[in-house]
Every structure is written in structure tokens, then in C-alpha cells.
Amino acid sequence: MKSKENLQKEQLYREFVQREENLIHAPYNPELEFYSCIREGNVEKIKQLCNEPLTDKKGLGKLSENELQHFRYHFAITAALAARYCMEGGMSLSKAYSISDFYIQKVDTCKSRQDISDLHFLMCVDYTIRMKNLRKKKICSQPVAKCIDYICESLHTRIT
């Protein structure tokens, strides 16, 4: 394993190379808008935003030398952030994580850029539709939802 100093030097070198190659990351505000649309259940807007395939998006940081692995990592990041935004919007913790886990496991089986992009579209629309339906029901507040999560997680233990 590399020392902390060697890791820092390597990181500085990679930052230098990125600047030299004019590699830039995508702006933050469109990313916030994207996840907010999922949280709000805005299906039409998510379909618009996902119209450009994940594998064609500009400004994605380089996460792997292996192209498919690179996109799988970005997919996993999207799944994790979508889950968190959905939890903020009232989806139960167990449901949000379960969906995220499911799609991350599915992306492992993808064999092409197109497979990953197609699954990305399906996942984003799935989360968004679920949030739209959840907002329709809106039967309880977030604190009550947290209590329900706790009870569900503790069904096989004594609650006192």
C-alpha cells in the first residue's frame, strides 16, 4: 500500500493532468435539479433530463480506466444519491436502499454502454414514479415514517 505522501503526490499529479487536458466536471446546479426532480416525482422532467444517455454525458469524472466500470461507478453514485433524495422526500429508508441495492446489482450484469444507459433511464424513472405515487398518498409525516421504519426493522426484537 502506498504511503500518505505518495498518495497525495499522485493526487496532485492527476489534478495537474486533468487541468492540462482541460477535463472539467459538470456543473453542480443541474445535478441538484436532477435529484430534486426525482424527489418531487416530476416524471416528465426526469424523462427529459435522462434523454441524453448516461454514457454520453459530459463532465463525468474519470473513475476507472475500464470504460464499463467507469460508467458502473457513476451509475452506483446516481443510485445512492437518488435513494437519499427519495428518503428526504418521504420514502422509507428500507425501500430507498432496497431499490438502490437492486439496481446496483443489476448494473453489474450490464455488458455494454447501451445496457448501462438503458438501466440508468429505467432506474431514474422508477424512483421518480415511486416518489410521485408517494406524494399522492402522503399519509404520514417524515417523523412518523421514521417510526414506521424503526418498527419494521425491529419486528423480530423486543421494542421497549
Locate each region found by the language model.
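Poly-acidic low-complexity segments
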Residues: 42, 159-160
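Alpha-helix N-cap and coil->helix boundary residues
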Residues: 94-98, 139-143, 159
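Basic, amphipathic alpha-helical hairpins
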Residues: 107-110, 130-139, 148-159
